[in-house]
């Protein structure tokens, strides 16, 4: 019965996406997508704090050796009115950079133009703390961070952290959640990753040492490192220490979906 409900939700989601796609295609035929590129730079101390509240679109954040925040934002909409209504406000101080994005107003009529997205590409000091990233719908990628911690929340879409050697608290409501490491380091880190509806994947090197606690409420947990899945009612769970001197703690949770931990073999 649960599988049937899950399948029906997926069918409904697919139908909605196709319907929205047809609306977007009609708008594109009526007029091309307008763009406005915004580029800004702000100094930020290596131990500073960064936060971003985005609107629908994409966010790519890269940790660098610099002591500044470089922002490239591409605003997109179907009309000049909605393009100009997208506001990007930056509060920049020596130890804090905070970006707030305001979307165009919600139209009163159901079939009115609802366009308005921002594609962010942001470089920040790799040792900075990411206090908050909020993205409603789209794709969020965080790469190469080594600060105190990362906190990120995505309502719908895909979230990826890659080679981020710091504590992480990351959440996706619906879509896909990925935690990737090409190699591991001895620095102790703790990762709390949770997805409500969708799959969670982790990729770790073969020689990784870590404590894994993964629970899928209505799905399966699988790992290339261990076949020791246990079931408690509808829950699938793996709770195991892999390797010696494990200083990395992985806490993974999936509501409706699966969790898989795979090995990176070079």
What are these model-derived regions, one by one?
Residues 1-266:
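Intrinsically disordered, low-complexity terminal regions
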